[in-house]
Amino acid sequence: MKQVKELIGKRVLVLGMAKSGVASALLLARIGAEVVINDSKSRADQPQAGELEAAGIQVVCGGHPLTVLDGCSLLVKNPGIPYTNIVVKEAEARGIPIWTEIELAYLISEAEMVAITGSNGKTTTTTLVKEMLEHSGRKPLIAGNIGTVASEVAQKAKAEHVIVLEVSSFQLMGTNAFQPKVAVWLNIFDAHLDYHGTREDYIAAKARIAANMGPADYLVYNADDPTVVQAIARIGATLVPFSRINVVEDGAYVKDGTIFFKDEPILALADAVLPGAHNVENMLAATAAARLAGATVEQIRHVLSHFPGVKHRLQYVGSWEGRQFYNDSKATNILATKAALSGFAKPVVLIAGGLDRGNDFDELLASLKYVKAVVAYGETKSKLLALAAKANVQAVTAERVQDATEKAVALSQPGDVVLLSPACASWDQYRSFEERGDEFLDYVNTIIKPS
């Protein structure tokens, strides 16, 4: 890894002892900084406190005394900690720079970075780029908001690697020198306004992905999103558009039902596995980014024609007796289920339900065009029955996802899609959307692959 000489001997506060905080503290100690780490939870709730102290790091738990900032030249904070936190506000008042862990990862990395952000589609696009590069003989390492701590990956990365990094607005706010070789900005929707305060601040945080890029760097951006187009107007990178609607000859686009990158035909959309207009955008963005980072057309084509989707995110599970099964357990809101349904122009048996947050499901009415039946479960099942009645769609209820899937199979015929896309959070019955999706996968796999 590269040395960061300006941090040697400097006192640095790491705020938050989640995964990225612990990784940052250990990295800073390795660099040669004097490190103190602080978390509001008690020491009894911090199993890694001993490891940190063994590395020479001062551990302060059980509150946020402002004295932890005394003598500090830098604050590295967990991305989820808001800027309204008393320690963060005090650091700002004292003029102490505030970073997140991806800034550290960038500074030490010997490998080039491909960074992907956006309100939706980050994980799918990040995974696609990683697969395209891997199949092309590059050595990609996936990291960031996708679950692998970026600074841990960056310590292991060599010059021959490429770090493919999923980054959130929370992470990007704490960057200073961060400069990926290729950046992707997928889209912008109103989100996280409780954290950022205003839509303008949220957009500005996203735009930091390209703030330091120059003409030798590439920003792949959504030319169909007017907010993104406006936000990048002063960016110094070489701009590479992608568009699902128009032909953009200097980027990635769809022409006559085929994905192109510049003048290179990549793949007919009919041969891609991922359904939905939103996934066309993800595929276009990934194609452009991977091509710019050294992937071959042949291997991009191979990945797009075989990639089943990220687990629980409109994931293609398999087929049985002419029925196709998709796991979209990550669809924890109505907007996500609308996006999933937009991807199918064949009969769908929809499995939906979960935690009742007081939502009005009438927003889904227009999206039920191809839905032949609804299997509703969980706290919202009565609301979903009412929705189905308004749409003149057959509906039944179930207790849990496995029961719902059995009933969905019984209601389906060859040529149909059986889709788990709950439109609700899982917490009425499941600890997480992953646990809910795994129950669906377990049952479907017993059908597809009987023991």
From Swiss-Prot:
Compartments, record wording: Cytoplasm
Xref: SUPFAM superfamilies: MurCD N-terminal domain (SSF51984), MurD-like peptide ligases, catalytic domain (SSF53623), MurD-like peptide ligases, peptide-binding domain (SSF53244)
Annotated keywords: ATP-binding, Cell cycle, Cell division, Cell shape, Cell wall biogenesis/degradation, Cytoplasm, Ligase, Nucleotide-binding, Peptidoglycan synthesis
BP terms from Gene Ontology: cell division; cell wall organization; peptidoglycan biosynthetic process; regulation of cell shape
Catalytic activities: UDP-N-acetyl-alpha-D-muramoyl-L-alanine + D-glutamate + ATP = UDP-N-acetyl-alpha-D-muramoyl-L-alanyl-D-glutamate + ADP + phosphate + H(+)
Cysteine disulfide partners in this protein: none
Residues reported to bind ATP: 118-124
Regions that span the bilayer: none
Domain of life: Bacteria
Gene3D superfamilies: Mur ligase, C-terminal domain, Mur-like, catalytic domain, NAD(P)-binding Rossmann-like Domain
Pathway: Cell wall biogenesis; peptidoglycan biosynthesis
Top-level enzyme category: ligase
EC number(s) from the headed UniProt entry: 6.3.2.9
NCBIfam families recorded: murD
Protein family according to the UniProt entry: Belongs to the MurCDEF family.
Identification of the protein by name: UDP-N-acetylmuramoylalanine--D-glutamate ligase
Gene designation per UniProt: murD
